[in-house]
Amino acid sequence: MKILFISLGCDKNLVDTEVMLGMLASRGYEMTNEEQEADIIVINTCCFIHDAKEESIQNILEMAEYKKNGSAKALIVTGCMAERYRQEILDEIPEVDEVLGTTAYDRILDAVDAALAGQHEVMTADLDALPLPETKRLVTTGGHFAYLKIAEGCDKHCTYCIIPKIRGNFRSVPMERLIKEAEELADQGVKELILVAQETTLYGKDLYGEKSLPKLLRELCKISGIRWIRILYCYPEEITDELIQVMKEEPKICHYLDLPIQHANDTILKRMGRRTSKQELIDIVQKLRKEIPDICLRTTLITGFPGETQEQHEEVMEFIDTLEFDRLGAFTYSPEEDTPAATFEDQIDEEVKENRQADIMELQQEIAFDKAEDMIGREVLVMIEGKVADENAYVGRTYRDAPNVDGLIFINTDVELISGDFAKVKVTGALDYDLIGELM
């Protein structure tokens, strides 16, 4: 039988998808990307913000309609929306056969069996459970890079965030398990490991009594075949001297950190439930750049948080202009039910949120272009992602570029390159967020 798997949302959700795909493949199910070929449809949903929720609902309704009129025998919904609105989905969309909560995805085979048997039910587990199925993941990212989810859940409880209620408290994956998984990924040809979690920098505190990300990184660096290790979702206040030292000493660790700060005004930061002040953020960024001069820093910001004044927005703009982050994304605040911030009375109009977002991204575009121009003439190591259709050119990424969120480098060459290969490239031109180069 053939299964269509639709994975929505973040890279952490994608890891869950790949685990489920591995379990299904081990049972002999064949995967398809064509809905008309599918006997079973599985949708791994997201509901972190309003747009993600809408996308999940749209996909569920579209596949429900297809199941009603097509050949699919079962429709299963998993992921964050399934955890949050489990019974509503089952009750209001009769075409959905099974709903799997966020900590029950390891029961995907049971869900398929139940759906094919005509059952309609919700399968959940303790929200603080940590599924660790033994089946190897089916990597869907092209084979040369893969995400390694090192922890689940979050204890921070920022006032705008629903994650602790749908993903549970912070809990780390045992180190030996992660090393085994990383070795398996390397054996499959993966060359870049991208460490993800709701918060990577707190890794190990719950298991080992201390933050153990530096130790994990040193162990991962020993794995043959792995060339790059990249760290995403680092909370600024959890950055330690030991982590910085490991990044300086281990050549496999990309000099790149994803450091979400969300805002730069102290009043708003406190209302958000963040643990850092504006000055502390400045100090952290300056320290990282002093200790690792070629580090690439990515951050994210929320615009239009309840109560944000024009003056506070301008303070954020000045902060960005001063610190000049290498990579930056800005998102409009989305009120999520069951979060404290959604009950704040001083909500901001959508138009104001969007205008402030546009202000930030216009400024960041200028910063990004200046930084791209600074790269001209430099020699960089590039991981090849693929060939540009109908052209003698390839696309790749430098250590400064995480997949799907950062830029690319376009390489003009007649030489045949293979996805996953590394090549030395001289940067010859700059675009807004991308680079142009030639093979050396």
Protein language model features and the residues they cover:
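Proteins enriched for Cys/Gly/acidic motifs involved in redox and nucleic-acid/cofactor modification
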Residues: 1-203, 242, 253, 257, ...
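Short glycine-enriched, charge-decorated loop/helix-capping segments at active-site entrances
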Residues: 47-48, 167, 207-210, 270-276, ...
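Conserved SAM/AdoMet-binding glycine-rich loop
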Residues: 75-77, 84, 187-313, 321
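Short, hinge-like loop/turn segments at secondary-structure boundaries
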Residues: 93-94, 115-118, 211-213, 247-248, ...
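Conserved, mostly hydrophobic/aromatic
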Residues: 178, 195, 231, 259, ...
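Conserved N-terminal phosphate-binding loop of PLP-dependent enzymes in the Aspartate aminotransferase
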Residues: 225, 325, 340-344, 352
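Terminal RNA-binding accessory module
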Residues: 343-440
